[in-house]
Amino acid sequence: EIELEVMTCPKMVYVKQKDDFLTTDELDANDRVENISGTALRQALQHRHALPDWFSFPEIIQTLQTAYPPKHEQGFTLFFTGLSGSGKSTLAKAVQAKLSEANTRTVTLLDGDVIRKNLSAGLGFSKKDRDINVKRLGYVASEITKHRGIAICASIAPYVEARRFVRKQVEQYGGFIEIYVATPFDVCKSRDIKGLYQQAEEGVITGFTGVDDPYEAPEQPELVIDTSQMTIPEALEVIFHGLQQLGFYENNCATYVSQRHASKKQVQFVAENMTDII
């Protein structure tokens, strides 16, 4: 027996015409109660809408605004995935250059080949090793995102489950925008100056994605780009228009993609499926 008495705290509400907080038991029939739901609060913070003075102390509101910045101030990860030769790295470098012009957030390019050399040395190309490599890439991207930077990943990342793991890891801290570079196999093969596709087809090398190892196409990517159907500048317009639509990029001088460049076959927006990151 420790003789503790449980104390209850009555629910308090703000009554506008009385400019006071009352318990629900003290309300009159004609009292007008003001209320902000959790969803409304998140939306107000996300869009930098002013919160009413009665909601909280100014210092607390300022702390909330600092802790939950709008999307265009949050960190996010752009994750380019596709076959070898699809144009992932070229697009990633072009996006990095354009984002760096804004100079509002740190932009870091994480190229798959560089990650393999520096973080995944010793790993092979079995499914297990490839998944480990992609998850390491995702961890670095999540740390960049957590500190409100922009991570740009360019990796074949052939398996859905590993990419899903990375998405979940990153979305703890910010946005995750998966960009499927869906350039056709024959086009990718024609761009292969090293002849790796031919060697894989001849059996000289094994475990090559798209030949004797599967590439599992993304199920619901935020963007789909086919570099055989558009130039790099056109693809950039699609990507940055997508970032604006999703709320992660603000630039009043940005060129909006034309209807000709944004056919359904070239780009698919699934912003409605984005996880609420606040």
Residue map of PLM features:
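Active-site cores that bind ATP or allylic diphosphates and position pyrophosphate for catalysis
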Residues: 1-74
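Hydrophobic anchor at the beta1->P-loop junction of P-loop NTPases
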Residues: 80
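P-loop (Walker A) phosphate-binding loop of NTP-binding proteins
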Residues: 83
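ATP-binding Walker
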Residues: 86
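Walker A/P-loop
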Residues: 89
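Conserved substrate/cofactor phosphate-moiety recognition/catalytic segment
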Residues: 93-142, 146
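ATP-dependent NMP and nucleoside kinases share a basic, alpha-helical "lid"
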Residues: 118-124, 141-201, 207
